[in-house]
Amino acid sequence: MKNQLLQKQAHTYDAAAFKRPPMFFRPGTLFPILCEDDLCGLTEKFNDLKAKGIGRVAPWLIPASRYAKYTGSTLGIDYDTPEYWQALKTIQAAAEASGLSVIMHDESGWPSGQAGGKILEQGGNDWIRHTLQPTASNPINAEPLEKGSINPDTPQPDLLNPDVGSAVVELVLNKHKEQLGGSLPECMPWVYADEPTFGGIGHDPIKEFIWTEGLEQRFAERYGYRIEPFLPELTDPSQETLSLETAQARVDYFNLLAELFEKNYLKPIFEWCERNNVASGGHLLLEHDPRRFMEGGYGHLLRSFRHFHIPGIDSIFQESHPHKRSHHFPKYASSIARQTGRLCSSMPFGASSCAVTPAIFKWTIDHELVRGINLFLPWGYSPNDDIHYQWSRPVFGHFGPLWKYMDVAYLYTARLSYLLSCGTPECRTALYFDMRSIWAGEPWQNKAIEAQEAIAQTLLNTQHDFDFVDDLALKEASFSSDGELVVGKMSYDTLIIPPTDWMEPAAQEVVQRFIAAGGTVLSDSTPDTPLLRTTSPQPMLRVCKRNCLGESIYFLVNEGNDPIDTTALFAETKLPEQLVAESGECLPTYAEQQNGTVHMPLSLAPWESRIVRFTEAATSSPKISQSTQQQLDKWTSKIVEQTVIQEDKITTLTPEDNDFEASALTDWCESIGNDFTGTVRYQTRFNLTADERQQSWTIDLGDVKSACSVSLNGVLLGRKLWAPFSFKLPGEALAESNVLEVDVSNTLSNLFTSTEYLSQVDSIYSEEGARYVRILETWEKETRPSGLFGPVQLIRAT
């Protein structure tokens, strides 16, 4: 059986597949198991997940013996015990019965590379990470680093040691193969690595100078000189600027660590997966910030990503957020995925709190999709309603008021994952990834990072797509017949190289050949070849494009907090149609052809996105103007559900004999209270004459926090999780006297910032868990405002 994760995806767009996306493209979800109860009722839980649009589950057994302090786990099942394997088999059977695929974590906990502690049980101190601790008699004396890379209480194996890499293959991959049996592409199609590192959070690459056995000899063999004379200066944190010779030694040292990590850890896992028809995937540590690349402990980011069939990222602690930054970092992974013809994944929302409103969910997914991500494994699902296991949020689960809406969010994600995997990406610009300057230290490091950040931001702000290329990509590049730089599956006519002193000579030679072949090389400027043009500058408009056998698909995203109102100019000969990811619909759209360019009015609300497909079948629709007929101001409301904590369980209560009362359209925190989490039903009435009932009408709710369900005269109009909160009114549902009802549900932020809950945090969670909760509390308080804010307008199309 072929593993679909290892196959190239379809080249053509199919309307039926967009409407009902294949299970392959549906998002997965982490399935944390922190207690034995989480293993109960799996079939029911998996059926519910599938009904919500989930296609994969990633079971994550986290034993109390290693992680109680950090997660509150009470799970008495350790890795590589009969109970552990039985639990995985039970999960697999339930997933198969529900039609879900299983992603297998390569670690019971995190970070990867420990085999649940079995690695160090086998190798002892010799296999622990070591740091250089020179003595008077031994300048290369190395001592075990007793603290862990993420969990300080647990030492980390030395992932530069070839024996450790071999042991991981044996104690993790072969163990899973032996215990799970069957066809690996069926029972274990995707092995997920979570933050393997030879560094770690808080690791100072100078103060904690990583060393592995025989490194000095490998260094001499690799570079032809000894590192020992340079060590005093290399390991001195007070040395702000190094001599050129010492900086070269520093570059060579970090390059050697990168090579050892690739050769001794990543490559054996990748090759095992190749032999066994399994996709290797996952993400590294701190890949979102170039200033922390060396702390992340993965050597060279792009080179390491090449050793994943599905390179990926995660975005935790609001690293991607509309009120913080619109950064390019997903492109580190997606560049390698494009160049190798592979898929690219993301694990968003970890430890980002219940402040992940539906609108922020969409913004984050859009942010990563438009940068090349096309498979998702979001954090947040909790199989357990016990409050003790909700320390790392967001929380999506059957007990939350938004769960009944999540199929809209997950299917939105799936449709775009499918759509943006069709065909090939349109990308003609490559940006040099200068890892060697980062390794060199100051003054080169900061200059390289600032240049990369500035150029990448300018490219995004001017609607250019781009990929990163590094020294290895340049050295292995070829040239097309018309002189383009060919890197794997991608071809580039423009190469941007910020000023650098550290590009490898062999890469420099390729650049010169590219120039001789007619290629464009820029240093501190960007090309003027955007994917589309606009009649006014739009620095917060992001665009990507897919070419699908003569058709073009554009994904346009307003990442800003202000509306966009412009005209988009496309270099296309066909007319566009609009694809709607929320519903799978295809709608005609107004556009004009002028002098070989398609002009399309483009109005996007903050965080709104648009899919435009250019195809022979498309026809331009007439311009539709709208006039506001009336504003609906007289409202009543009542509570229909309330989510509370009872006996340490998150529970939903349904009030009895609850009558409608007059209500203003305002934050219900002011009327019901800050702590209220649940659903409120709003009701209003309006009249239409017989002539008016023959018109086309839309109801626009204005501002809603956070999600809503709308019905007219008992007929469900639909559900929305983000703006625009507008609904077409079907003619058959209209009456002379009409009753409009709007159910609004909010996030769990209000529950988790309630006075009662916060007063118990220190007794509910471990010290580390409580620390996390205090971080999340600040963000959750920012998203307390809830309800129907309006203005609600009844709009007639003319």
Name each model-derived stretch.
Residues 3-9, 21-28, 32, 39-44, ...:
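Carbohydrate-binding surfaces of carbohydrate-active enzymes
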Residues 13, 46, 50, 54-57:
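N-terminal regions that are enriched for targeting/export leaders
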Residues 94, 111-182:
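Catalytic and substrate-binding clefts that recognize carbohydrates or anionic sugar/phosphate headgroups
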Residues 568, 686-713, 721, 740-744:
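Aromatic-lined ligand-binding clefts that engage carbohydrates, nucleic acids, or primary amines
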Residues 618-619, 745-754:
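Short acidic/polar inter-strand loop motif in beta-rich domains
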Residues 662-676, 680, 759-798:
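Non-catalytic, glycine-rich low-complexity segments
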Residues 687-689, 727-737, 748:
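Short, surface-exposed tryptophan/glycine-enriched loops
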Residues 717-727:
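Aromatic-rich membrane-interfacial microdomains
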